[in-house]
Amino acid sequence: MSLQKLMEPEAGTNRTAVAEFILLGLVQTEEMQPVVFVLLLFAYLVTTGGNLSILAAVLVEPKLHAPMYFFLGNLSVLDVGCITVTVPAMLGRLLSHKSTISYDACLSQLFFFHLLAGMDCFLLTAMAYDRLLAICQPLTYSTRMSQTVQRMLVAASWACAFTNALTHTVAMSTLNFCGPNEVNHFYCDLPQLFQLSCSSTQLNELLLFVAAAFMAVAPLVFISVSYAHVVAAVLQIRSAEGRKKAFSTCGSHLTVVGIFYGTGVFSYMRLGSVESSDKDKGVGVFMTVINPMLNPLIYSLRNTDVQGALCQLLVGKRSLT
């Protein structure tokens, strides 16, 4: 089947363009909307405050000027970006009692969401590679994970994530939407928009499948293999304190990986379902709100260096100047 055929609308469909979508949101009862507003506002403030605090600690604390914390600082930026793409717009709709989003704004939200989510995939992989070198090859670690290598890994991650997000957005822009225009979600995402298209989504679903293999399966396999080597190396450490410290740094990362990939698999591996459900909204909340809010807690609670840097930052022993 040709590329042109895949992008053609189905015969007999009305080709009238949809100018805006209606996002049904998390709840549709007016009584619950103030509660949802307060909870989302609280989550947004906690997430931005927590992640920006970790970023500030990484920048000002010399102990944290190491590759692992360089990647952690980047992860904090991503977490702030991820929740900012969805939550402020939803808060605005709750305040204005308007649930519409323009077609262009919907595509923009789709692009930035997949840009940041894709970057998350590659950054978590880079963090696993960092732990692999630090624990399994400590003698060459400083050379193989130099500042140049760190920056190259982050730059390559941004380039791959940008390419993926742009591909999905351009492919989505080729679809025809002729009604209905109600999105059973609180932000614009691929599976929900596929269900509203009156043209074929075969190409889009194929692209999503290929992207999942490249950006989810391959990184997850690499992370799993890396940590298998890490566990084998840690078990050979004779010092109980050394084993505990190694497992604590790796445990935080594995927890974040498990939550991130678990929610991602549930969201994008269910394209055969006929319609969106409240489960999709729950997973969406986990991906865009809970994950970014939990990440700083997961890393700070299990890492004494981060805890110490945050305490120094909060009591004012160090300043950003």
Swiss-Prot record:
Entry protein name: Olfactory receptor 3A3
Segments in the Cytoplasmic topological domain: 59-66, 130-149, 229-245, 302-321
Annotated function: Odorant receptor.
GO CC annotations on file: plasma membrane
CDD domains to which the protein is assigned, alphabetical: 7tmA_OR3A-like
Disulfide bonds: C106-C198
Lineage, highest ranks first: Eukaryota, Metazoa, Chordata, Craniata, Vertebrata
Membrane topology: Multi-pass membrane protein
This protein's UniProt keywords: Cell membrane, Disulfide bond, G-protein coupled receptor, Glycoprotein, Membrane, Olfaction, Receptor, Sensory transduction, Transducer, Transmembrane, Transmembrane helix
Species assigned in the record: Homo sapiens (Human)
